[in-house]
Amino acid sequence: MKFGKSLSSQIVETLPEWRDKFLSYKDLKKRLKLIGGGGGGEERQAKRARVAADGGEEEAAAAAMTPEEAGFMRLLEAELDKFNSFFVEKEEEYIIRQKELQDRVARAAGRESKEELMRVRKEIVDFHGEMVLLENYSALNYTGLVKILKKYDKRTGALIRLPFIQKVLQQPFFTTDLLYKLVKQCEAMLDQLLPSNELSVSSEDGRGDSTNEDKPSNPSSSLVNGGTIPELDEIEYMESMYMKGTVAALRSLKEIRSGSSTVSAFSLPPLQGDSSPEEQQELWNKIPVIEQAAK
């Protein structure tokens, strides 16, 4: 699948409020078509060398550009600003949310409140899914920049991809160490909560067959407060934006960062211990049905 179609598919799968935060790949391709072919490459390089001798490399690159090329680069810079603003805002939000969830877990455990623990656990899984989406956001936008710059170099005869990507590697949206740490802390909270405090959902009093505890495949036959969970709740859960988006994001991350016969200096490293799509689905399935219905 071509990258443009893959990106569009990922944008559809992600959270609605995120959709305008991704790389404007179509707009960049339209701008690229306005740029003439790569003729005059030798003249371009000669002009760049003359300006570089008098000034800096950036001034030389700008001087060698046509107005259309300069417009393309301005759009690229605006895209970087967009990525960074959104990514930093989300990271700051996640730091606060992580602390709040840790405090809620501690309070609920102290009061031995199973209902509160269930609600918090559901929120933690949603939170984990959203952070995985942000990891995917970073990887997708980086990959899109690499691909559009390759097209630019091919069309214009310029060689800006390497210096521009070196600049990208220093941008906040690409620096995911803190995000990775938050994801791992979130997984540690889930590891702490999931093995214990499990509620059976096969009977009113919570004492059911243990073999059914991790099988939310038939919520309509389970009992909550003496009644069955409507099928609507099952549908709403299965269509959860977090679940669908997160599993799709993990598949995309695995594809983008997997080994390839065309590995280059621009390739992202393979995933390091992140959950697979199957593991993320399994994580969601571990949430008892009584929690799935509690939005």
UniProtKB/Swiss-Prot annotation:
Biological-process GO terms, alphabetical: cellular response to cold; cellular response to phosphate starvation; negative regulation of unidimensional cell growth; positive regulation of cellular response to phosphate starvation; regulation of leaf development
User: What is expression of this protein induced or repressed by?
Assistant: Up-regulated under phosphate (Pi) starvation in lamina joint cells. Up-regulated during cold stress. Under negative feedback regulation by PHO2. Up-regulated by the transcription factor PHR2.
> What residue spans carry the region label Disordered?
199-227
Q: Where is it located?
A: Nucleus
Segment forming the signal sequence: none
Tissues where this protein is expressed: Predominantly expressed in roots and leaves. Localized in leaves lamina joints.
Tell me yes or no: is Nucleus among this UniProt entry's keywords.
Answer: yes
What is the designated name of this protein? SPX domain-containing protein 1
Q: Which organism is it from?
A: Oryza sativa subsp. japonica (Rice)
Q: What lineage is on file? A: Eukaryota, Viridiplantae, Streptophyta, Embryophyta, Tracheophyta
Gene encoding it? SPX1
